Amino acid sequence: MEKLQNRILQEGHALSETVLKVDSFLNHQVDPDLMYEIGTYFKNYFKEHKITKIFTIESSGIAPAVMTAMQMNLPMVILKKQASKILNGDVYQTTVHSFTKGLDYELTLSKKYINKEDNILIIDDFLANGEAALGAARLVQESGAKVAGMGIVIEKSFQPGRKMLEEKGYDVYSLARIAKLEKGLIEFVK
């Protein structure tokens, strides 16, 4: 997606060889027009996949996921990173390691919001090592539902996430694929 790549080049900051800061339009301040366009790309790519629900992981995936859900006229479910007293234990849970934060968390899904007939599209802001996406997929599979695909806003193609997900048979669609990061340099997959 050329518009997204341009925003990354204009406003993104490669803080290291593995960390890209895009907080001015994606995960701190959000550009709703860009998110709407991102939703359009995901809708167009996944329109034949018979999606029943959009899933995302709190919190940075919420903006692109809600725009995708709006455009597909589907409900969106937010997978929680922390246990909540209001979920009453009737949940699916799996442990996920966060690359960005360097810690483990319990990804949680209320059983109330998924059934075995569901065909789930997982939307996330970043794909690096694939841990978050795999965790979300485990929750979907534990319920008996199916993962129809994964929509990623920004993929770090130099990390193993895509390869791992594709080896497990997932349809991964990324809007911006980064080939290389260096302090002050961002290169896209050609």
UniProtKB/Swiss-Prot annotation:
Task: Give the EC number.
Answer: 2.4.2.22
Cell compartments where the protein resides: Cytoplasm
Sites binding 5-phospho-alpha-D-ribose 1-diphosphate sit at A128, N129, G130, E131, A132
Reactions listed under catalytic activity: XMP + diphosphate = xanthine + 5-phospho-alpha-D-ribose 1-diphosphate
Query: Which biological process annotations from GO are given for this protein?
Result: purine ribonucleoside salvage; xanthine metabolic process; XMP salvage
Keyword GTP-binding set for record: no
What are the GO cellular component annotations? Answer: cytoplasm
Q: Which InterPro entries match?
A: PRibTrfase_dom, PRTase-like, Pur/Pyrimidine_PRTase, Xanthine_PRibTrfase
Pathway, per Swiss-Prot/TrEMBL? Purine metabolism; XMP biosynthesis via salvage pathway; XMP from xanthine: step 1/1
Q: Where does xanthine bind?
A: L20, N27, K156
Q: Which UniProt keywords apply?
A: Cytoplasm, Glycosyltransferase, Purine salvage, Transferase
CDD domains the record matches: PRTases_typeI (cd06223)
User: GO molecular function: any one?
Assistant: xanthine phosphoribosyltransferase activity
Job of this protein: Converts the preformed base xanthine, a product of nucleic acid breakdown, to xanthosine 5'-monophosphate (XMP), so it can be reused for RNA or DNA synthesis.
How does this polypeptide assemble, per the annotation?
Homodimer.
Entry similarity comment: Belongs to the purine/pyrimidine phosphoribosyltransferase family. Xpt subfamily.
Protein's name according to its UniProt entry:
Xanthine phosphoribosyltransferase 1
Q: Which organism is it from?
A: Clostridium botulinum (strain Langeland / NCTC 10281 / Type F)
Q: Which gene encodes it?
A: xpt1
